[in-house]
Swiss-Prot record:
The chain crosses the membrane at residues 14-34, 53-73, 136-156. This is UPF0114 protein in repA1-repA2 intergenic region. Keywords: Cell membrane, Membrane, Plasmid, Transmembrane, Transmembrane helix. It comes from the Bacteria. The lineage of its organism: Bacteria, Pseudomonadati, Pseudomonadota, Gammaproteobacteria, Enterobacterales.
Length: 178
């Protein structure tokens, strides 16, 4: 009975697969939105202000960052929770090397980068945004920054504790051998 339950739980990991496919669909939507912005700007290029152009470019950068975040979550999540990808020759260098903690750190760093781009966009349009909203944008951004820094710090502490424990165990093993 126990083996059947464990097998069912193990097989249930495939239930997350449609969610990763959904993220692939979101990536397609982001690609369409990216090129919509690019095609929108082409006819306007000689008439748009410099700050308007910068705002469009910031929007494009925002889309690229979110797309990269989606790819990272899809690939590393699939490899960590479903199955290893058997891709010869075209495999990305970081695939298979990211554990859950490094994924969390990468995701939080990407969120901070996305928030930074959004905050820069808000600062470029301060005349359209109330001071109260700007303050809230800054508070939210700082919350992301502090959270990302805190998670990275905790991850570093955990890794140093693991390394310290590993060294202590190897010292004890070596003493017993003597």
């Amino acid at each position: 009975m126990k083996n059947i339950i464990e097998k069912m739980i193990y097989i249930s990991r495939w239930l997350i697969f449609p969610i990763y496919l959904g993220l692939s669909f979101c990536l397609i939507l982001l690609t369409l939105k990216f090129f919509q912005l690019v095609f929108f700007i082409f006819p306007e290029i000689f008439f748009i202000s410099e700050s308007g152009l910068i705002l469009v470019i910031l929007s494009l950068i925002d889309i690229v960052l979110v797309g990269g975040l989606l790819v990272m979550v899809m690939f590393s999540g699939y490899e960590n929770f479903i199955s290893k990808m058997n891709i010869e020759g075209d495999k990305l260098g970081w695939m298979g090397t990211m554990d859950v903690n490094s994924i969390k750190n990468k995701v939080s760093s990407a969120i901070v980068a996305i928030s930074s781009v959004h905050l820069l966009r808000v600062f470029m349009e301060t005349e359209k945004v109330s001071n109260e909203k700007i303050v809230w944008y800054v508070i939210i951004h700082l919350t992301f920054v502090v959270s990302a820094g805190g998670m990275a710090y905790i991850d570093r502490l955990n890794k140093s504790n693991i390394n310290s424990s590993t060294r202590k165990c190897s010292v004890l093993v070596n003493r017993r051998k003597k």
